[in-house]
Amino acid sequence: MALLKPFPLQHSLRCMASRFLLHSHYHTHTLSFSSISLSRPSIVLNPRVINKLRRLSDAILIRNMVSLRAFMSSSTTTEAFQENTKSKGYGSEQIQVLEGLDPVRKRPGMYIGSTGPRGLHHLVYEILDNAVDEAQAGFATKIDVVLHADNSVSIADNGRGIPTELHPVTKKSSLETVLTVLHAGGKFGGSSSGYNVSGGLHGVGLSVVNALSQALEVTIWRDGKEYQQKYSRGKPITTLICHDLPVEMRDRQGTAIRFWPDKEVFTTEMQFDYNTIAGRIRELAFLNPELTIALKKEDIDPEKIQCNEYFYAGGLVEYVKWLNADKKPLHDVLGFRKEADGITIDMALQWCSDAYSDTMLGYANSIRTIDGGTHIDGVKAALTRILNNLGKKSKTIKEKDISLSGEHVREGLTCVISVKVPNPEFEGQTKTRLGNPEVRKVVDQSVQEYLTEYLELHPDVLDSILSKSLNALKAALAAKRARELVRQKSVLKSSSLPGKLADCSATNPEEAEIFIVEGDSAGGSAKQGRDRRFQAILPLRGKILNIERKDEAAMYKNEEIQNLILGLGLGVKGEDFKKEALRYHKIIILTDADVDGAHIRTLLLTFFFRYQRALFEEGCIYVGVPPLYKVERGKQVYYCYDDAELKKVQRSFPSNASYNIQRFKGLGEMMPAQLWETTMNPETRLLKQLVVEDAAEANVVFSSLMGSRVDIRKQLIQNSASMMNLEQLDI
C-alpha cells in the first residue's frame, strides 16, 4: 500500500471510487465562491484575482472510474451581492406574471435543486425516470443513455412513445404540450392516467429539462411513423415533422431525447460525470429486473470511450449481495415480493457479522427516498417487534425486563425496500421522503408475515440474528459505561478543551473554522500562520484509531478520538445531531501530501462518517489542499499543486531559464507565512467540501477499504491500480 504516493486517501478514495465527488469551496467574509474542475494557474506571490484560483487539484480528485460511482458529490454556488436599497414603489405594475416556462428559467433551483453539478445531473435523471416509468408500466425493456463528446446527453427507450395528437385543451400537439407546459403529463393517476405507477407526479420533469436546455431534440416512433421536433430554451424552433417508417421498421416504438444544457443557467459546471450517472443507472437496473440499461460515454480519444450495460435478473436480492460483497454474511439474502391494497412491496435483507451499523435504502416508484419515509418506518417497526417476540418465544431473550431496541436489532443489517404506490405523497419536487401513512401499515404487516414464517422455519438463522442483536445490546451497554467514564473525565461535557487545541477568538461557530493537522511540526507552523480571530488548530499525534474495526467502548477510550469529540463539539454517537452544538461549522482536514498524510485523512473521514454522518450532510467537512512544489525564478515564486501545474510553469519559462524547485514533503517544511498564503488564507486557498451523495455506496467503500477483510481491500486496490498514473508511484 505504500507504493502509491497519495495512497490511502487519494487512491483509496479514487478506489472509493467514482463513488466520491469532491466539492471545492473557498470563502471570504463577503463573497462565497465554489468550483469543480475549473482551470487555475499556479499561485504566484503577487496580488491576484480570486477567480484565478478556481480549480480542483488532483490531490484527491475522484472521477472517471469505470465500475464505481461517486458517493460524495459537489455543488457549485456563487452568492451574488445583494444591494440594500429601498423599493421605489409597490403597485400593480410591480406584480409580475411569469408565463410558460419562465418560472423555471427564473428560479431553476426550485425545480432541480441547484445550478451546480447536482442540478446538471438532475436533468438526466428526469428524462431517465420517464423512460423507467415506461418500463414499470410494462411497455419498455431497453434504455440507451449516451454522453456525447459535445456534452449533450441522449436517452432513448423502446416504450410506447410520447403521444403526438392534437391536445384538446392546449390546441397544440401532445408532444409540444408536455415539453412546454408545466404540470402537463400522463402521470396524475386515476382512470385517465397513462400510468398506474410512476415516479413523475407533477408533470414538470420533461418541460423543466426543455426550459433549461439551449437545445433539445426529440424523436418519437409510434404507429409506424417517426416524429421529430427541435426546441431551444423551452420554445419550439421547428414544427413537428412526421414521415412513415420503412416497412421493416414499422413495429418500432419509443422516445429519444437529446439535450444540451444551457450555459446561461449552468455557468459554473457543465461536465457530466460518467460514474455519477452510472451509479443511478445501476440502482434503477437493480430495482427493475426486467429492464436493461446501456450507458456509453463518447470521446474523441478512442481510449477514453466508456460503455457498460446493466441488467440484474435477481433484482433486490442481487442489490443486497452487491452491497455486502465485502462483508461476512450470517445467512443467505432473504427477499420477498407482495402486493396488498394496490401497493407493491419488494424487499431484500441480510445481516452480516462484521458490520456494526445498518444500511437501509428505501425507494418509492424507483425514486430513492434519501430521507426515508413511511415504508422505512414500517420495516423498522416490524423488525424490532418480530425479533423481540421470537427471541422471547424461543427463550433466547430470557430476562423479562430486557428488550432489544431497533438500533440493536438492525446492527449489521443491509435492507433494501422498494414500494410501488399509485398515488405517492412525496415531500417536494426532489422527492426525498415518502409520506403516505397507508404504506407503513401495509409494509409492517407484509414484513411481519414473511419474516415470522421464515425465521420460525429456519431457527438457525433466527439464532444467529438474535446472537448478533444481543451482542449489540451488550456492546451498547459497554459503550454507555465508556461514555459515562469519558464524561466523568470531562471529555464530552466539560468546558475544558484539549491541551493542544489552539482555539480562535470567534464565538460564533458559523464564523469559526478548525484545521486538523498532522503532528506538532505542522501544528506549529499552522498556529503561527493562522488568523487567530476565526481559525483554530488541533494537532493530531500520529494516526487516529481506525474505528471501522473497533467497538464504541474502545473508541471512547482513545485519547485522540476524545480530543476530536471534545474539540469539535461532536456530542455522543447515536444521539440526534445538532449543528448548533458544533464549535466550528467548517472542519478542515489538513495533512501532508504523502502516504501517511493520505492515510490520516482516510482515518479521519472514516471516523466522521461512522461517528456523526450528519457532518457531511450539513456540509461541515472540508479537505485543505497544500501545494506540492515551490518554484523560484528570480524574484517570482510559484506554488504548484500537482505535477501537471509544475510542468505548465516550467513550459512557460524560456528554455535557458534558471530556476529552483522545492518539493514540500510535509506542512512542517513550509514557513508560517507560506502556509497562510497558499493553504489557509480564505482569499487564496483551495478547499474541497465533502458531501455524501450516496450513503449506501459510501458505506460499501469505507467497509472495503478500512474493514478487516484483507482480501476485499486487496481486490479493491488491484481493480483500481490500472487507473493510477505510473508517475505517481512513490518507490
Curated annotation (Swiss-Prot):
E.C. code? 5.6.2.2
Concerning Gene3D superfamilies, the annotation shows: 3.30.230.10, 3.40.50.670, Histidine kinase-like ATPase, C-terminal domain (3.30.565.10)
Keyword field contains Isomerase:
yes
Tell me a GO cellular component: chromosome
What family is this protein classified in? Belongs to the type II topoisomerase GyrB family.
Residues at which Mg(2+) 2 binds: 592, 594
- Please give the name of this protein: DNA gyrase subunit B, chloroplastic/mitochondrial
